[in-house]
């Protein structure tokens, strides 16, 4: 019954490592051997007890041999003590072995617990890694989407670059055209400057003739001869309707040069208006009608006016050179506008 703790510990050790099992098997073998030795010793003791009984029975017969028997008994007692001492030593050895096995079992349990904690920690690490893998997969998917978007944008940019290259070629071609146009414009400007000089001289001559005509009409004086106006027959005076329409254009272009002549004309016109009230109607009313028609309706003031020819009735052919030189001004403005627009675009 003293070996019961070992029997209680044996069913608790199936979870140990194979090394512990081997140790237990060795211990069990040793215990079996010890039990066998004990059984043999017990048998021997029983035999000795039987022998003692037989000796006691035979004491009477062996009184003579008491001394020899005593010596034998003492020997047997000594042997029994020795056997008891041996049994005690064996029990102590078994107890020490049981303690060692219990300590080993505790160590194995500690290792098992440590392994369990490590397994739990590693499982947590695995879960964390799985979560990180999921997040990385999501990031990869988003990165792939962004890569697709960037690829589409790069394709668009490449298409735009191709368009810009073609646009550069077109711009170079247009620049060459612009250089040609600038050269043509320079030539046209030179020609227009020459034409403007001729036109200014013609306008001055026409203004002088108009002034003379107006002064002669308003003051009932005969007009000067036509030879003083122009030498060429092609450069004849325009009719008053054309003169009235063209005078503002010429005045707008030559304001700084002809300010003094304009002041003189205004003073002369005011003086003539005071003399003849019919001229105010010519200036204030319908500008489209010629002044000669309005002047006819007014009665003649002197007899000399009837005999003298009326200058307004003389309708001279328009100056063809003035009209021809007036037309190139519009292309000039259009060319200048086109050049300015193309410069802004560049």
UniProtKB/Swiss-Prot annotation:
Q: Secretion signal: which residues? A: 1-19
Q: Which residues form a coiled coil?
A: 16-211
Tell me where it resides. Secreted
Keywords in alphabetical order: Coiled coil, Glycoprotein, Secreted, Signal
Residue spans with biased composition (Basic and acidic residues)? 286-298
Q: Does the keyword Heme apply?
A: no
Leucine-zipper: annotated span: 164-192
Q: What is this protein called?
A: Leucine zipper protein 2
Specify the species: Homo sapiens
Its gene is LUZP2
């Amino acid at each position: 019954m003293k070996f019961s703790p070992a029997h209680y510990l044996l069913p608790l050790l199936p979870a140990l490592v194979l090394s512990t099992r081997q140790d237990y098997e060795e211990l069990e073998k040793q215990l079996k051997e010890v039990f066998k030795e004990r059984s043999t010793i017990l048998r021997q003791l029983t035999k000795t007890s039987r022998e003692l009984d037989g000796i006691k029975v035979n004491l009477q017969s062996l009184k003579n041999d008491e001394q020899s028997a005593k010596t034998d008994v003492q020997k047997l007692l000594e042997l029994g003590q020795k056997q008891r001492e041996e049994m005690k030593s064996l029990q102590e050895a078994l107890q020490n072995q049981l303690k060692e096995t219990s300590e080993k079992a505790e160590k194995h349990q500690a290792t098992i617990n440590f392994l369990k904690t490590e397994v739990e920690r590693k499982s947590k690490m695995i879960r964390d890694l799985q979560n990180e893998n999921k997040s990385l997969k999501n990031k990869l998917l988003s990165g792939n989407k962004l890569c697709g978007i960037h690829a589409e944008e790069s394709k668009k940019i490449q298409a735009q670059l191709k368009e810009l290259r073609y646009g550069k070629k077109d711009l170079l071609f247009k620049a060459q055209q612009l250089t040609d146009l600038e050269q043509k414009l320079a030539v046209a400007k030179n020609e227009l400057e020459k034409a403007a000089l001729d036109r200014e001289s013609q306008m001055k001559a026409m203004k002088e003739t108009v002034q003379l005509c107006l002064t002669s009409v308003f003051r009932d004086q005969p007009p000067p001869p036509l030879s003083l106006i122009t030498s060429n027959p092609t450069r004849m005076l325009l009719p008053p309707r054309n003169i009235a329409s063209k005078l503002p254009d010429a005045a707008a272009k030559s304001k700084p040069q002809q300010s003094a002549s304009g002041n003189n004309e205004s003073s002369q016109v005011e003086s003539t208006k005071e003399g003849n009230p019919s001229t105010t109607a010519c200036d204030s009313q319908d500008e489209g009608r010629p002044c000669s028609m309005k002047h006819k309706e007014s009665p003649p003031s002197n007899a000399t006016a009837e005999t003298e020819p009326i200058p307004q009735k003389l309708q001279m052919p328009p100056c063809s050179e003035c009209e021809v030189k007036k037309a190139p001004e519009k292309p000039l403005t259009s060319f200048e506008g086109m050049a300015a627009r193309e410069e802004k675009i560049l």
